[in-house]
């Protein structure tokens, strides 16, 4: 291999390894009075969407004030998480339901 080929190979390698830079979204299904998955991990700037597949109304309510509001069966709501941290949430109607969003 010629020495001049090394920089080209390095550029190709780094391009192949690099991501798009966009934060990948996550989805949380609500079914059988549970958040599935109970914990999601996303990068800062990502959207998390809650989809209610249950017969009862539910929320994803955070202490910080973020809230999906009441979601009836088939409803969905996305929230965007800008700052790294761990964000626990509960259903305002069913306190035994809880989940967590981990933002890296």
Where do the language-model regions lie?
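Extracytoplasmic copper-binding redox domains, predominantly the cupredoxin/blue-copper superfamily
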Residues: 6, 10-104
């Amino acid at each position: 291999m010629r020495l001049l080929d090394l920089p080209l190979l390095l550029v190709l390698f780094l391009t192949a390894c690099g991501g798009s830079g966009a934060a990948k979204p996550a989805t949380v299904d609500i079914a059988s009075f549970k958040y599935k998955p109970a914990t999601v991990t996303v990068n800062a700037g990502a959207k998390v969407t809650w989809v209610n597949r249950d017969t009862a109304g539910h929320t994803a309510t955070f202490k910080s004030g973020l809230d999906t509001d009441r979601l009836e069966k088939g409803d969905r709501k996305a929230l965007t998480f800008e700052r790294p941290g761990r964000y626990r949430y509960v259903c305002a109607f069913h306190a035994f339901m809880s989940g967590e969003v981990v933002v890296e």
